[in-house]
């Protein structure tokens, strides 16, 4: 997608378990298809209301997307989810079962979470884990350079929205370089 909030991809990662616990845990995520900016939360449930709470958080922070892409999980095909999208004039785009690669950006984020958060952090307490994950998401958006957006962070790309209305990398790179200090320099 070439414009911010033209489409977001949503997914649920999990379940995963903490040491010495049978409690299921999940990450519910929403990613802007253009800037790669992520809104994500740790949840002990994966119900439609939890997915909607996260989508509402995304909208409050980033504005309303034109379209939401998701798999066919029951959280995304429920009446309450679809009704929310209709009432808010957000298009609904579900991908066919068995084709997660169609949501490659959110799946790539999930892989990063598995490899750089779950595999690295020793988490024994849900509340502490939620704080750590919140810091991870913040660092992902604000500090982690992204190859798919020319080495800029998702927040740098998203913050350019006030000056630009497109994520066309050929046009945006020069303008971002002029206005933002590149991470790591």
Place the predicted regions along the sequence by residue.
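Short small-residue beta-strand/loop micro-motif enriched in glycine and branched aliphatics
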Residues: 35-41, 93-95, 119-120
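An active-site-proximal beta-strand-loop segment
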Residues: 4-39, 44
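Mobile genetic element proteins and their domesticated derivatives, centered on retroelements
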Residues: 11, 30, 36, 55, ...
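Acidic/histidine-rich, metal-coordinating catalytic segments
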Residues: 46, 62-78, 150-155
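C-terminal domain-tail junction helix/linker
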Residues: 88, 112-185
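Basic, flexible linker segments flanking DNA-binding modules
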Residues: 1-10, 15, 99, 153, ...
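Active-site beta-loop-alpha junctions of metal-dependent nucleic acid enzymes
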Residues: 23, 40-62
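RNase H-like two-metal-ion nuclease catalytic core shared by retroviral integrases
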Residues: 70-72, 76-85, 92-115, 127-131, ...
């Amino acid at each position: 997608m070439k414009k911010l909030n033209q489409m977001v991809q949503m997914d649920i990662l999990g379940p995963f378990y903490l040491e010495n616990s049978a409690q299921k845990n999940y990450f519910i995520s929403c990613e802007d298809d253009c800037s790669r900016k992520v809104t994500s939360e740790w949840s002990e449930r994966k119900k439609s209301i939890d997915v909607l709470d996260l989508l509402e958080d995304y909208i409050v922070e980033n504005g309303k997307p034109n379209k939401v892409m998701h798999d066919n999980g029951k959280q995304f095909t429920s009446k309450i989810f679809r009704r929310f999208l209709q009432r808010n004039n957000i298009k609904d785009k579900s991908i066919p079962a068995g084709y997660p690669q169609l949501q490659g950006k959110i799946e790539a984020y999930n892989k990063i979470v598995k490899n750089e958060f779950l595999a690295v952090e020793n988490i024994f307490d849900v509340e502490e884990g939620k704080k750590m994950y919140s810091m991870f998401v913040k660092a992902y958006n604000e500090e982690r350079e992204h190859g798919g957006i020319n080495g800029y962070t998702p927040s740098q790309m998203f913050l350019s929205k006030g000056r630009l209305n497109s994520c066309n990398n050929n046009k945006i790179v020069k303008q971002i370089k002029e206005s933002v200090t590149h991470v790591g320099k």
